[in-house]
Structure formats: structure tokens, C-alpha cells
Amino acid sequence: MYIEKLTIKNFRAFDEDGITLQFNKGVNAIIGENNSGKSAVMDAIRIAFSTVTYKKDIFFTRADFHVSEDGNAADFALFDIYLEEVPTRLVEIWNPESVGGQGGEFHIRFERVIAANGIEKVRAIHWGIGTEGNPLSSDTFDAMDVMFLGALRDSENEMKPARNSKLAQLLRSLVPDEVTRAELVDILNSANKTLLEKEELKKTRKTINDNLARIEQDFLSQHVDIGLIEPRFDSIASSLRAWVKPKWILVSISDGEYSRAQQYAREHEDNRKIQQNEKGIYFETSILENVEDMAPELVTRINEIASSSFELYQNGLGYNNLLFMSTVLGDMAIERGGVYQHLLLIEEPEAHLHPQLQELVHTFLSDTNQGDANIQIIFTSHSPTLASKVDIGNINLIYENAHKKYCLPF
């Protein structure tokens, strides 16, 4: 299921005539000059798909009503979303009379209302096929998975250990069955047990509990245990963190394994994953994926050196953005029962990326969609490199003429 058409009226920069954008399956781009309304389109989609309360991460406010050039604010705003390849089970939005019988639609109207206490508020009315006012249920929106990556995304913080981090979400999606989750908890229990056998840990636990007993006396009599993390699957997911492995490692001329490294380099002089200079011999860490003919001592040494890493904050912003996008797309590509639409919204995916990497990003996004045709990607961009890679029929140009906003689908 994917968005085929979107109409926006009286929302921010868009007046009562509004604009209409056309989308296709796969990768779509929205382009236009600064302040043309690209971000407003993305926010309109986010608001539309977070209609049910528990899915809201963005809200429509009174400031979102369009204000005309004469200073008058609109009394209503309207979003019309038209979909294709809608399953028949989504009866609230499926339109059996559409071309091909697979179309669907839903609508959200926002109105200014005066509450009984005289305060102006915003009322939202949403409906699917049929009469305005027939509300949509949460079941319909549960079938739609929408993810947004903003232009000012903080990839470093998003990847930090937390209950709702992207890494935690990915692990929960990859390990849905309780048997495997229990196996992971058993491994953690074993690690905790081994750790607590160390005398230093025993002393730490005893010190805490002795002091606690002195404070509590006979009132609470609580006892504290310590370990790596609480032995529960959610704790494992919440504690996951990402760090960056070095691409190249150096076995220096003063290293005890230098002679073996030198011999291996001579035997594999055509291997581009091995380089040599006056400092020693460099190995690309990916060489460890196939080292059947490498001396075990050298393998061990390369692994020791490669075990060094650095935190994400020490990494470049561009590469952190790539890591973040990879994690999000990995989670979205996992098949889930009852989910028929995966929509990824990205503002300026070119942020902090060299043009060559921008090309790789587009290739990655396109390949991801081909692997799972159920993922639709819509991004905004100022990058000629990215825009030139998108099919001409998948580009929407937003522009202004004679004080009005227009959208030109190519």
C-alpha cells in the first residue's frame, strides 16, 4: 500500500486552493526553493498518519491554519490522502469502485471552534470512504507504519542505549518469539553470574547492602543486587549501543606478529585489503571474513587490534546519518502481520554527505525498495545530485507564482 495522491488546503503556506502532489511506489522526491513548503508537506503527511491519539508525534495547532497576505487566518484546513494497493480488509478506507478496485482514501479536516469557556480550539474530523464524520478506527492506522527522519536529526542520540532507541526497536522486530528471547536472557544471566563471582563485585554489593541496612534498620529490610543489566529481554534491547570499528588496522614493524604479517602480505601481494609502508602492514578489517590460510597467531593479533573502536560522537555526522538510516530501514523491511504500508519520510538525506556518498544513498534507498516493494520513500532535497537520480515521474516541484503556491508533478 502506498500514497498515490495528496491534497493540502489552508495549511501554513498553502491557501484554500491548495496543492496536489502525485506519488508513486518506490523513491519520490519533493524539490523547491527555500520556504517553498516542502517541510509543510512532510508535516501534513505526518499529521495525517498520526490521527489516532496514541500514535501522535506531531500536532495540528492554531498556528498551522493558513494566513493570507491580508492577515486573515483560515477557518479550516483539509488533508485528502489517496492510496493504492489497499487491502480489502481495511474497509474504512478501501474504495471498491476505484480504478482497478485497489484504491482507497481518507480525509482529515481541522476547524476552529470556540469552547464553552470562550477559548478557541482546533477540532479534527477524520473519515474514510463515505460520509464526512464517520471516524476512522485505530485498527486502520495500525496497518500503516510511518517513520520520519527530520533535517536536524540527531543520529548520535537516536542510537544511544534507551528503551525506544532505533537499535532496541530493530532487535524487538528481529526477535519476536519468546523462545529466542529467553535464550538471550539466559546468556545474560550466565554473564551476570560470572561477573558477580569476582571478589571486587562481591565487595561492591556487600558495601551497598551493609550501608542500606544501617539506614533502613528494621523498617524496610531491602536487599540490592548488582550486575550488568536486569536479566530481561527489554533490558537487553534497551542497553544496545553502536560504535564504529576501524576500517584499517596496522601491524607495526615493532609488533611481535610483524614477520608473519609480512609473510602473509608477500603471499597475497594482489590483495587490495593489504597495504604496506614504512610504518608496517595495514589490513582492512573485513579481511577477517576469510582467513583460512592465515596463521592463527596473526588472526588473533589482528582481532586484538581491530577490537579497538570509537564512539559515535567521534565519528563524522554524515556517516552517523548513514548508520541511522540503515537501522531505520532495517526495521521497516521486517515483515509484520497486519502492516500493509511502510512509509519513510526523510528531510534532506544529503545532510553532511559528499556528492559521491549522496549517490550511494540513493542507490541504497532504491535497492531497499526493490527488496521490499512495500516501502515507499518520500524525501525533500536541495541536492542536484540526489534529484537527478530520481525517476522524473517521481519528482514533485513546489514553486510560487503570482503570490500562490503550485506543485508540478513531472
Where are these regions (language model features)?
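Switch/communication elements of ASCE P-loop NTPase nucleotide-binding domains
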Residues: 1-50, 243, 249-410
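Conserved P-loop NTP-binding catalytic core
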Residues: 42-102
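Short alpha-helical segments and helix-capping/turn motifs at coil-helix boundaries
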Residues: 62-66, 94-95, 129-135, 210, ...
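Electropositive, glycine-dotted interaction segments
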Residues: 78-80, 86-193, 202-203
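Flexible glycine-/small-residue-rich
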Residues: 81-85, 150-153, 228-230, 244-246, ...
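Glycine-rich phosphate-binding loops of nucleotide-dependent enzymes
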Residues: 175-185, 192, 209-213, 225-233, ...
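Amphipathic alpha-helical domain-onset/packing element
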Residues: 196-237, 261-286
